[in-house]
Amino acid sequence: MHYCERTLDPKYILKIALKLRQSLSLFFQNSQSLQRAYSTPYSYYRIILQKENKEKQALARHKCISILEFFKNLLFVHLLSLSKNQREGCSTDMAVVSTPFFNRNLWYRLLSSRFSLWKSYCPRFFLDYLEAFGLLSDFLDHQAVIKFFELETHFSYYPVSGFVAPHQYLSLLQDRYFPIASVMRTLDKDNFSLTPDLIHDLLGHVPWLLHPSFSEFFINMGRLFTKVIEKVQALPSKKQRIQTLQSNLIAIVRCFWFTVESGLIENHEGRKAYGAVLISSPQELGHAFIDNVRVLPLELDQIIRLPFNTSTPQETLFSIRHFDELVELTSKLEWMLDQGLLESIPLYNQEKYLSGFEVLCQ
């Protein structure tokens, strides 16, 4: 049975539902209301499947999938709040729980709309990395991808429901967890997705982790975040802590945005794209090479002071000459952090990209 067919099979749905119920019992043992809320639709679905009415079965199946996605998201949010030791001590089978309800036809169509653009506008070895992960197949073997990911990269696969606030994202990187969205965009969002999804994370970020400079970049950024927190916690007033954390964090976020999210590289192959926002979006990728976009050499002092807009195609992009520049960038950023040079970075009304960080300033 194909994977996409299996996810619609009643017995398989019940298996995942049972696994989720066990997980929720483990994590929310003190919340009887949550357990009751889950048990009711689970029991309802099991009863409906015994009926002969195919229409009711189909309706119940889709209802159950929605319920499962809701509780998966609830579980992911809870996991984000755990410490590293708590996550490692978790007995939940996350390989099963993290599996998305996969639509093979949708995956194939989303992949097909990007492949010719990747051949034209991405470095050759990016396609090699995709192939190594098995991501160029019209059938995504999610468990094989997770296994290869954890064997060949410096990170553990960490499923999330979508957007992760920067302070949570960096905290996960520091603990060597790589957040990967479990939801996939629909065809009407093919060209441009406002929020990170499976296409953005799995196709735009994950393949690059086979390159040592990318792995080191992500690891270093997580480590720098820890230094920022230590620095902030030593400040006497909450107002100082908030201002300092905001300023340092927006500098880190902009470094991410203008490199691994929207970055270009110019080498012997010519100008190519490596940023996940470009790679995952046919509209963004085409815009970067066909339209009149300003491309500048990557300069740390410039990018940490430059605001960006995630909701429209980019008008200014930055280019590197080799991927070692990503590691060099983190070294320069750390020096600026140590010298106190990141404490007066203008926000330009970009506070929305720092949502939830105040919990670190208590």
UniProtKB/Swiss-Prot annotation:
Q: Which InterPro entries match?
A: ArAA_hydroxylase, ArAA_hydroxylase_Fe/CU_BS, ArAA_hydroxylase_sf, Aro-AA_hydroxylase_C_sf, Aromatic-AA_hydroxylase_C
**UniProt keyword Metal-binding present:** yes
The protein, known as: Probable aromatic amino acid hydroxylase
Query: One GO molecular-function annotation for this sequence?
Result: phenylalanine 4-monooxygenase activity
What cofactors are annotated for this protein? Answer: Fe(2+)
| Gene3D superfamilies to which the protein is assigned, alphabetical | Aromatic amino acid hydroxylase
The protein's enzyme class: oxidoreductase
EC number(s) per UniProt? 1.14.16.-
